[in-house]
Amino acid sequence: MAGYTAASAKAEQDWEAKFRALPDPANLRSYMERLAARPHHVGSAYDKDNAEWILARVKEWGLDAKIENYDVLFPTPKERALELVAPTRFAAKLEEPTVAGDATSSQHDEQLPTYNAYSIDGDVTGPLVYVNFGVPEDYEQLERLGVSVKGAIVIARYGSSWRGIKPKVAAEHGAIGCLIYSDPHEDGYFRGLDFPAGPFRPKDGVQRGSVMDMPIYPGDPLTPGIGATPGAKRLALSEVQTLTKIPVLPISYADAQPLLAAMSGRVAPEPWRGSLPITYRVGPGPARVHLKVSFNWDTKPLYDVIARIPGSTSPDEWIIRGNHHDAWVNGAQDPVSGAVALLEEARGLADLMRQGWRPKRTIVLCFWDGEEEGLLGSTEWAEDHARELQEKAAVYINSDGNDRGFLNASGSHTLEKFINGVARDIEDPEAKVSIWKRLQFRRIARPDSAADRQEPRTRADLRIGALGSGSDYSAFIDHLGVASLNLGFGGESEGGIYHSIYDDFAWYSKFGDPDLIYGKALAQTAGTAVMRLADAELLPYDFGDFTDTIRRYVNEVEKLAQDMREQIIEQSRRIDEGLFAAIDNPSDRLLPPPKETAPPFLNFAPLENGFAALQRAGEQYSQAAARAAAGGGAALANRSLREANAKLIAVERALTLKDGLPNRPWYQHQIYAPGFYTGYGVKTLPGVRESIEQKQWKLAEEQIGRVGKVLENAGEAIQSAAAELAGGN
């Protein structure tokens, strides 16, 4: 067991086995029934009630805990109206009805209306243009179709990117409003039976959600970079960068169908067609729509519940575990299914303490508020405690909504080997093999190529994903450079109730994880990870998997630059040859793509040199760690590892730059970040990758040099940890 002596590993395994016997699905079910009983969005009475109930439980179990409050901007709807004004008239309902057999779907007085938070106020009328998913590539296709959205209201379907990208790109192209609807092709009847007969989105179901421009910064829009405490300096609303530039409203496919059916113009390309019984057309016109939204721009309180278990020997090294407790409505799946696992972990750890267990490091258990609106509670807490976290935070482990199926682990690749080791020790409740083995089998079974099947058989560790944004790890990894993991289960329970009134106990107990057995598995997995990190003599970071992953990222950006150069040259050649005009269908003409200048060759030597230094340092650390672990880990037992651990914690910090990424300084990590045009989706080596994607060649050269230096700095931090560790031998 990495980071342990032979003797301490045996003791740790015994304590972990005791812990894994404690989580009980009956407890998880009872917590879920309580927490999801009523709507509990930010500012609601039940949001506060839930926070106080969680606080009472963890105190009752014997943990030191408190609620930390922040005051954040949270707009709620004042007026919403959407109507088709030509060629016929239709008024959208903009309501989700009660469903028979689902008691909490009738709690309309407490439910937030269907809306997108952080849309600006607006009252606009214009022609309707269908933009598919509303991502940048769709606007390139519209340009070839000869369709402009300038002065139009666009309608985009949910999917392909985070929702906030859709109004952002629409505004960049001159649109005056944005509608976002859930097409049954993505999560409705095309996928299976709709709720309540099945798990998928009913015709009137609507996906609420934030459209805050989180790729700029998450958290309270008025206090970027600082905690939203009572005395904090706040921006004026007119100064906020993260509000949309045009009004936005989400709608159901029942409300979208009459609008789409009223459109004419060119038939939408085949990949743009959803599953409504209409002919999908692009427009513009003759459909004209009137959209009006206005909001109460109020400040609301957040209630973060923070519990601590003090470390016995290294109290100033923190292992932080978090899950949010707020929801858009009742939120049984998102987030309560994850929050109940964290509650059961807290109960289990408290039980072990009564049996005599004490962690070496401090464990901090966090139940965040305000995640749904823009990662508010976690971001404000992290910004408020930034200095202390930079000194003390070793690892952050996050979870969110949890379902049935396979382990999904993403995070810092310095922790890839560690979480693989944890996964080998957890039994899957259905397959009765380890969750690691079940995931390995799935990866072997799914790929089409022999090479892809071979890797999970031959590589020592299963690869974990990289983190972008979309949950409460963002402030820790993206802003502060704290090594992080995001854990959960899924893949066997599909559905279409996300951010609707139908995400409730009635749905989850039938279609989610009915017996809460994967809730138990999440508690076992995350709790074991927390214990193993908190109890290790030497923090179990590993740099072999990390450098292997960085090598892949470097290869990817080099190939991206080469491929883009070749594509631009080939496209220019085709334009000069008259190819597009010659093969165009006269009855369905497309404009040729714009001709572009061939990009310069990029010099990747600084990035390659930085990687080489990082790789050498990783090898040195592996050798030092192997020597320290030899002979049962006597070297670990016979000396203080405080400095070695401090230097290991500093490695992830070395992957950040204080001035952050281009045009978004809040995002300081140079290896992982949410994409500027993907939102939640990660971009690895983001400064380099996105400057290439956006064809900013001078910026790309600058970023290659900056990131190369960051890799060198990380290598120096790893070498320092290796030297400290070797000093005891």
Region spans (language model):
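Second-shell loop/turn segments in exported
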Residues: D14-L22, A36-A45, T114-S119, I153-S160, ...
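Metal-dependent peptidase/peptidase-like ectodomains
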Residues: R89-A91, P202-V267, S314, G370-S509, ...
